[in-house]
Amino acid sequence: MFDLHSTDRIRAWKEFRDSLEQALDPFHEVALFWSRAPFVNQYLNIKNPQNWPDPWKLVIDGKYDDLAIALGMCYTLQLTDRFKEHKFEIHTAMLKNELRYVLIVDDAVVLNWEHRSVSQVSDLHQTIKIWSA
C-alpha cells in the first residue's frame, strides 16, 4: 500500500481496514501492515497533538516516524466497526534505552512496542500517556 499513489493508497487502506472486521488476529495484522511503512526520523511533534494529521492526511503524506506509525495503527483500528468503541491511548515508553511511542488498546494490548508484534501492557515497565481517543 505504501508505494501507491494517494488515491490508491487510501483505497488500499480502506480494504485493509475492512479485512480487520473478520480477521482472526486483527492486532497482529495491524502490526504487520504498519511494519511496511516507510520510516523517517521525525515527522510529528509530540507536544502538539492538535496539529497531528487526520487519518487520511497521515496516509496521503506517506511520512512515518515512530509516533506517526502508532497514530496510524490507532486510526486503522478506530475506523473499523469492530473497534470503534474501544479505548485508544498513545504512550511513550523506554525499550533498551530507546524512547518508543506505543499504542495501547483497552489498557491491555500494546502495538508498536516491538516491530511486527503484539505485546501486553504487562510487558511495559513505565509509560507516559501523551494522547487518548
Describe each region flagged by the PLM.
Residues 1-133:
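A structural boundary/capping signal
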